[in-house]
């Protein structure tokens, strides 16, 4: 029997605005020593909030504090509430096989119940995954074809017709410039019926 001592429980509660029409799911947060705030995507080396800054404010540093060392959690939450974007992860408990945040070295001990999340956000019509492990876990729970990165596939959940979007990882380990990642995310946000998001002017 494997030791229970190394099991990490998810440190955050699901972020589920009542008006959420989009649920973004990663795999699991990085180790606390890599956090710059108590929220999702807390690592300064992860570009998720820079991607959001480019798309919604034409400024990749929009969600950084003036010292550039911390993300501004309150500004992030304000945007997510206004836009109806929910966040959580596909693993609720993991064991780290190495001392890093790579999905490759995460052993999932307990999966998140995706259907339970969706039942709490009845207006949600799309799920976004940002990595292979998250995509695999969703496909174990929901009957849906695996999307190619940058595309989506339809699926049914109860009385809802939904889509699963597979986005490129916001990790800098994923070899794609942030501008190209932002362009792919922008297409997804527009497809989920957000106000039309144009490319920033140069």
Segments and roles (model prediction):
Residues 58, 201-202:
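A very general structural signal that marks isolated residues within well-ordered alpha-helical segments
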């Amino acid at each position: 029997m494997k030791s229970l001592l190394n099991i990490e429980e998810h440190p955050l509660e699901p972020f589920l605005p009542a008006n959420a029409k989009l649920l973004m799911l990663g795999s699991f947060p990085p180790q606390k020593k890599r956090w710059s705030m108590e929220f999702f995507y807390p690592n300064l080396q992860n570009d998720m909030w820079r991607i959001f800054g480019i798309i919604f404010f034409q400024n990749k540093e929009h969600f950084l504090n003036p010292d550039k060392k911390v993300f501004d959690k309150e500004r992030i939450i304000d945007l997510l509430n206004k836009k109806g974007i929910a966040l959580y992860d596909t693993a609720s408990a993991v064991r780290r096989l190495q001392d890093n945040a790579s999905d490759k070295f995460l052993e999932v001990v307990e999966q998140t119940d995706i259907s339970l999340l969706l039942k709490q956000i009845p207006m949600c019509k799309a799920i976004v995954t940002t990595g292979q492990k998250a995509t695999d876990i969703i496909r174990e729970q929901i009957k849906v074809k695996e999307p190619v990165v940058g595309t989506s596939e339809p699926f049914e959940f109860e009385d809802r017709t939904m889509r699963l979007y597979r986005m490129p990882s916001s990790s800098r380990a994923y070899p794609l410039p942030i501008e190209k990642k932002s362009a792919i995310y922008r297409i997804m946000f527009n497809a989920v019926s957000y106000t039309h998001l144009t490319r920033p002017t140069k």
